[in-house]
A protein has these predicted regions:
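ALDH superfamily catalytic-core signature
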Residues: 1-112, 236
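Conserved C-terminal structural/oligomerization subdomain of aldehyde/semialdehyde dehydrogenase
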Residues: 92-252
Length: 252
């Protein structure tokens, strides 16, 4: 539903705000964008207006060499640096007014552990992916990205379609989804989205954590449970299992 210039401009602004915070070093900063083919070109133009530099294929290969080693491990000296510095390390120059770099990632075929631009960047660079057809194709790309990394943390969606938002929420292995807002600002908690303010985000069992909430004061407080005898209130197995109940399950 990012199908008007105004909505594309807002989505691009949200992307720029999230990508550029702390030079893109935060886990909540945008790393991969999945955009429908029908609005892709116009959205890229909106990103450029917001300060994106679109790297060509040769520049993208140079960036890859200074961001990851030959085994795919992220190189620390290009983490959290300005886009001009990142380009300089890669061997090319970008204008001084550019706020971040974007590489064109392609489609579903370019997502996977062997495709490094689909992994976490931790700097002022993002990858732009394009999908055609039904929204399910975008969800398939989301699944693939989280197989590369980032399960449990977060994602965002710029949409006014409640069905699309619901379908993403039902399948994405994340603890928080930001709708039409900068991911890094929204994840950390805001008076305009109801998320508890925090700098620590639980990622649930997806991320090896015990909670999937924003870590807040309640998580640092010890709770003492006082249990007194009460009348037994034991549901039947049929009530517990519902449609999965089979006759004889409660026979010892």
């Amino acid at each position: 539903t990012c199908n008007t210039p105004e909505r594309q401009a807002e989505a691009a602004m949200n992307t720029r705000i999230s990508k550029c915070s702390d030079f893109g070093s935060g886990c909540s900063c945008d790393g991969n964008i999945i955009c429908h083919a029908s609005v892709y070109d116009d959205f890229v133009k909106a990103l450029v207006k917001e300060g994106a530099y679109i790297a060509n294929a040769d520049e993208a290969e140079k960036l890859k060499l200074v961001m990851w080693d030959e085994t795919g491990h992220r190189l620390p000296d290009t983490v959290a640096i300005a886009p001009q510095k990142l380009a300089e390390k890669a061997g090319f120059e970008i204008p001084a007014d550019r706020k971040f770099i974007a590489v064109t990632g392609g489609g579903r075929e370019n997502i996977g552990k062997e495709h490094l631009f689909s992994s976490e960047k931790l700097t002022t660079l993002m990858a732009l992916f394009k999908y055609d057809g039904e929204f399910e194709n975008a969800l398939d790309m989301v699944r693939a990205i989280y197989e590369v990394g980032g399960k449990g943390h977060s994602c965002g969606i710029y949409s006014f379609d409640d069905d699309h938002i619901h379908r993403l929420a039902m399948m994405a292995p994340v603890s928080r989804i930001m709708v039409r807002q900068p991911n890094n600002k929204g994840n950390a908690g805001s008076a305009t989205n109801g998320m508890p303010p925090t700098s620590s985000m639980g990622c649930g069992t997806w991320g090896g954590n015990i909670v999937s909430e924003n870590i807040a004061l309640k998580h640092y407080m010890n709770t003492t449970w006082v249990a007194r005898p009460i009348p037994e209130d034991m549901p039947s197995l049929q009530e517990l299992f519902g449609d999965f109940y089979k006759d004889g399950m409660d026979v010892e």
